Design a protein with these regions (language model features):
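Catalytic cores of phosphodiester-bond hydrolases, prominently lipid phosphodiesterases
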Residues: 25-371
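Bacterial N-terminal signal peptides that target proteins for export
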Residues: 1-9
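Sec/Tat signal peptide C-region and signal peptidase I cleavage site
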Residues: 20-24
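Bacterial N-terminal signal peptides
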Residues: 8-19
């Protein structure tokens, strides 16, 4: 979405001496945003479960049969990742499932084309929402999704930093339905890191070591405004492990302050790895979010969930998310998503934009647009 607001903000920052011409640090503007803004000073509308296709008729029938009470909440989907980037989305989410030996999630693909069967039988993390029920994805493996990101980035090297939430899920057995005990272990988390580094390359990444800098801990680096500017971070991706406490403990094992790791994580504020927070429900948590972003942390929240806001036309959650100052506001209903029901609800930032100066952390003035 095109808006004059980023250009106005760039001009304002130039007048304040906060932005200048392109230097060795990078361009003066990135996608119309002032290059000297730090990542934590920008608010973006993102997508939730970004890999998820809109359910096919076959998938709808399967969900209605196996889990009818969940159908309404799963009745959404997104265009391919490249199409989301073309729209202007710069924060996405990819759900990953452990498959170190290969074949764990291959059963639904027994009658698929041979190349697809081969892909699902190969070792490596797969991308899906829930085994046997909600598994249709624009890219079947984590490696394949990363390849899409890298290919798009190579074709658009001046893009804003893109934040990727990597939602690592365990799937314990469910009697009579799912017989496996699929859990992420250290080796699986190491493999995610290896895939990220191999596909994306160091020159396309923002990693914890960069943000920590010379500080003793990652949290200290964050509090000292260690996030890169848009000029320094353009063309790069920031990956965030979205998991559970067991995963977080494993992920920092041998990597204090996430030294040498490719991803950030959702660690508590008092921990040395604290950097990014996930506060899914912004309503009633606005003060907490403002506290965190004012301290230098990144916060992700959601504008809508499980199709509820779209069905009700309820923008209260969106409004709370946007005004809270959370840098990433995820939605299933931005312009360009499949909308077969014709819901009027649409998520965007004020002015209809998908990214803007953050109203709490940026030099934006009262409206969060420009000073």
């Amino acid at each position: 979405m095109v808006s004059a607001l980023p250009r106005l903000l760039a001009a304002a920052l130039l007048s304040l001496g906060l932005a200048g011409p392109a230097t060795a640090q990078g361009p003066a503007t990135v996608e119309g945003m002032p290059g000297q803004l730090r990542l934590d000073q920008v608010q973006m509308l993102g997508s939730h479960n970004s890999y998820k296709r809109y359910p096919s008729a076959e998938e709808e029938a399967r969900i209605r049969t196996l889990a009818p009470e969940h159908w309404d909440g799963l009745d959404y989907g997104h265009p391919p990742l490249e199409a989301q980037f073309a729209i202007g989305i710069r924060q996405i989410e990819i759900d990953v499932a452990p498959d170190p030996q290969g074949g764990l999630y291959a059963t639904p693909y027994q009658l698929a084309a041979s190349e697809m069967r081969k892909t699902m039988m190969a070792p490596g993390a797969k991308v899906l929402h829930f085994p046997q029920i909600d598994y249709e994805s624009h890219c079947l493996t984590f490696h394949a999704c990363l390849t899409v990101l890298r290919r798009w980035s190579d074709g658009h090297p001046e893009h804003l930093p893109v934040t990727v939430l990597v939602n690592a899920s365990d799937f314990p057995p469910i009697a009579g339905f799912w017989l496996h005990d699929a859990k992420f272990e250290v080796a699986d988390l190491d493999a995610l890191d290896a895939d990220i580094r191999a596909v994306m390359g160091a020159d396309h990444l923002i990693v914890p070591d960069m943000v920590r800098g010379a500080h003793a801990t990652l949290a200290e680096g964050v509090r000292a405004h260690g996030w890169p500017t848009l000029a320094a971070g353009h063309g790069r991706f920031l990956f965030v492990l979205d998991a559970n406490d067991r995963h977080y403990a494993l992920y920092r094992q041998g990597h204090p302050s996430l030294r040498g790791r490719a991803m950030f994580g959702y660690y508590a504020e008092q921990e040395s790895e604290a950097s990014v927070f996930n506060i899914q429900e912004p309503r009633g948590h606005e003060a907490e979010i403002r506290h965190l972003v004012s301290a230098g942390f990144l916060v992700r929240t959601r504008a809508d969930a499980d199709t509820r806001e779209a069905r009700a036309g309820d923008v209260s959650r969106l409004d709370a998310a946007v005004s809270s100052g959370a840098q990433f506001v995820s939605s299933d209903y931005y312009d360009g998503v499949p909308n077969p029901h014709g819901f009027a609800y649409r998520a965007s930032l004020p002015g209809g934009v998908l990214h803007r100066c953050d109203p709490v952390t940026g030099p934006c003035g009262q409206q969060g647009h420009h000073r």
